[in-house]
């Protein structure tokens, strides 16, 4: 038990020059002694904090070193380009072969293309590491909080018939088939004079804008997709028609054309179909055959800066030509 482990640790700590390691200390020492690079050190932290299978697999993929090898390869190419440029600056009177200029230009273009290919990844690595963001949005009293509770299998949000009960963003973490999900219940969107509710509505719209997927929940008895709802449904969205058990007529043909699902949270109807649609969105978002993954915004910014510098280098050479 835990008490036995603590007792053993306490006794070991009494031995001279012996102490408990700090969190991450062995990884830190390995990095400082050149046994692993920063990318691998970060992937160890990602592996320890992995909550889903896909996060675990991604961390292991990076630990195996293909990303590191690729970045080292690009670095070596850039160093060769740099050494040639420096030689030209230091010895301007030397007649360097014209073929060298052509090769340097081509090499810089090749590196630039490779970096841009790595950057064109739909941010899959970062989404896997941080979680796939889903925002539940829509008008008041449509069943957004009930949907969050249903998907979470627990009471996360307060449910009430009073419109405007949810005023802040409520987040919870889910694991759907190994995919990490951060799902947010947001304030119902409507015209309101209440300052606090207006701030909540503003947060809702911001959450929807930054989400990887929007679940736009509407009441089957009063479907009005004009205005803001129409904007929300333009991309990365599923129209969730709740209270479909009360639906008297067929859906409007225009609504039927949208990516939609009819559900009833009260009767637990078609929730499985909604989850299936969410899974399809996840699979489409997470598909990546590439072994080179960017998992942090810092990595992305460094690559963007490098690509910009190479573009400037190429543009200046083109002007000289």
Give the positions of each predicted feature.
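Accessory, often N-terminal, substrate/partner-engagement and coupling regions
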Residues: 1-73
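C-terminal-of-GTPase-core extension/linker across diverse P-loop GTPases
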Residues: 55-175, 192-194, 210, 221-321
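Conserved nucleotide-sensing/catalytic segment adjacent to the nucleotide-binding pocket
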Residues: 179-195, 200
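Short, Asp-centered acidic motifs that coordinate Mg2+ and/or phosphate
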Residues: 181, 213, 238
């Amino acid at each position: 038990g835990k008490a036995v482990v603590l007792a053993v640790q306490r006794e070991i700590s009494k031995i001279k020059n012996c102490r408990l390691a700090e969190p991450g200390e062995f990884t830190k020492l390995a990095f400082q002694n050149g046994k692993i690079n920063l990318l691998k050190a970060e992937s160890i932290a990602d592996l320890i904090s992995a909550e889903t299978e896909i996060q675990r697999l991604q961390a292991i993929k990076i630990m195996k070193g293909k990303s590191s090898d690729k970045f080292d390869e690009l670095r070596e190419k850039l160093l060769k380009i740099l050494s040639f440029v420096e030689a030209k600056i230091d010895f301007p009177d030397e007649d360097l072969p014209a073929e060298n200029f052509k090769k340097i230009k081509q090499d810089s273009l090749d590196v630039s293309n490779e970096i841009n290919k790595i950057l064109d990844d739909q941010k899959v690595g970062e989404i896997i590491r941080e979680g796939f963001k889903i925002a539940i949005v829509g008008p008041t009293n449509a069943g957004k909080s009930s949907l969050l509770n249903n998907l979470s299998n627990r009471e996360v949000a307060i449910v009430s018939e009073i419109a405007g009960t949810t005023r802040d963003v409520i987040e919870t973490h889910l694991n759907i088939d190994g995919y990490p999900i951060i799902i947010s219940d947001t304030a119902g969107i409507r015209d309101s004079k209440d300052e606090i509710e207006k701030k909540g509505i503003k947060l809702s719209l911001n959450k929807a804008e930054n989400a990887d997927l929007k679940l736009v929940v509407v009441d089957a008895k009063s479907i009005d997709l004009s205005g803001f709802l129409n904007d929300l449904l333009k991309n990365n969205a599923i129209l969730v028609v709740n209270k479909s058990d009360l639906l008297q007529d067929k859906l409007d043909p225009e609504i039927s054309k949208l990516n939609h699902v009819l559900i009833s949270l009260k009767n637990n109807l078609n929730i499985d179909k909604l989850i299936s649609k969410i899974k399809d969105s996840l699979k489409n978002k997470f598909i990546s055959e590439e072994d080179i993954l960017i998992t942090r915004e810092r990595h992305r910014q460094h690559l963007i800066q490098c690509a910009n510098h190479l573009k400037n280098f190429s543009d200046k050479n083109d002007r000289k030509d």
